[in-house]
Amino acid sequence: MHKKLKAWGGATGLFVVALGVTIIALPMRQKNSHGTMIIDGTVTQIFSTYQGNLSNVWLTQTDPQGNVVKSWTTRYQTLPDPSSQKLNLIPDYSQSNASRDYNVLSIYQLGKGCFLAFPYKLLTAEKMLVFLSKRFLGSYHEPPR
């Protein structure tokens, strides 16, 4: 009886470990994206993972020479915009490391694995033009005023 109980306990333990590993591995199956945002002349690399309606967003702001000026991680609630390939991200302020520098981020999907993210209040047509022309035309010309 003791041996049967021990064998059953061992099998149960193995099952629990396997279940735990599966549960831990499940969040790894997230959609990863990389992109660049340009705000006031500074380039910011963005790396984010989406899972359900929550997003973890890692941002690294660099100067034109590529030196890191600031980097942070925060968690956002993802609000998809069904009319476009856009996600509005609202910071989850229950996270102690939530950055209030970026109240709302809008992420635009420009292609497979390519995203453009802007703080909502800073998003302007001119900045979109700067990004898109640099991205797809290779250069940027100041628009006529």
Curated annotation (Swiss-Prot):
Q: Which residues are connected by disulfide bridges in this protein?
A: none
Q: Would you indicate the residue range of the signal peptide?
A: none
Q: What does this protein do?
A: Involved in TCP pilus biogenesis.
* Protein's UniProt name: Toxin coregulated pilus biosynthesis protein H
Q: Please name the source species.
A: Vibrio cholerae serotype O1 (strain ATCC 39315 / El Tor Inaba N16961)
Question: What gene is this protein a product of?
Answer: tcpH
